[in-house]
Amino acid sequence: NGLCAHNFYCYMNNQLLEYKKMIDLRDLFHGLQNQMLASLNVNREFIEHPGSKGDATEQHWIEFLRTYLPDRYKVDKAIVIDSTGNVSEQMDVVIYDAIYTPFIFKQDGFMYIPAESVYAVFEVKQDVKGYIEYAAQKVESVRTLKRTSIGMVASGKTAAARPLTKIIGGILTTTSSYSGNDTVKVQLRKLKGLQTLDLGCLCDTGSFYVDYNETEPEG
C-alpha cells in the first residue's frame, strides 16, 4: 500500500503559494515495525538450533538499535563490570556511552563495559511468556554494581560530579503468547527495588512503559 501522504496547501489572496505532500510518520514507523517483525519471524521459523536462534535474534535487535540511536550511544552484547571487579550476568543488549567509555576488554565478540558508562540493558527472548522475572533478575545484576562519579575541569572551571541516574532495564521479544496484557501487568507489579523493568517491546503485540510514580503499569 505504501506510505500515506497528507497534502499541504498554503493560499494567499486565492493564490496557491505552496503545495507539498507530507509523509504520515505513524505509517512510517508502523512500516519499520512490520519490517522488524518479518525479520524476527524468519529467524524464529527457519533457525532450528535454540542457541543459534537466540544469537541471531539478539544481533538483529542490536543492529536495529545501532541504526536508529544517535551516534553517541553504542550497542553491544556484553558483561558489565565495576571498579571493584564485580560483574553482572551477560546482558543480551547493553546501551552505553560511546564517548566516555574507557577501554576495559574486548576480544572475539566478548566485552566488559564499565558500569558508569551504561544507560540501559535488555534481555532478548522469542516470547515474553515466563521471562519477566528472569529479565528482572538479570537487570538487577547490573544495577547492584558499584558506580562512581567525579567532577571534571572544563574551560578552567571545576564542574561538579554528575549525579548517577537509574540504569533503564527492559525486555525485547518477538511475540507474547499470553491471551492479554493482564498477566504481564501482574508480573510487573510484583517487581520491586532494583528488579523493576522500565519498558518492553513485544514486537507483534505491542509495548509497555512503566512509570513508577504511577500506581498502574501502562501497556
Each model region followed by its residue ranges:
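Intrinsically disordered, low-complexity Ser/Thr/Pro/Gly-rich regulatory segments
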Residues: 4-6, 16-90, 95-219
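Aromatic (phenylalanine/tyrosine) cluster motif
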Residues: 8-11
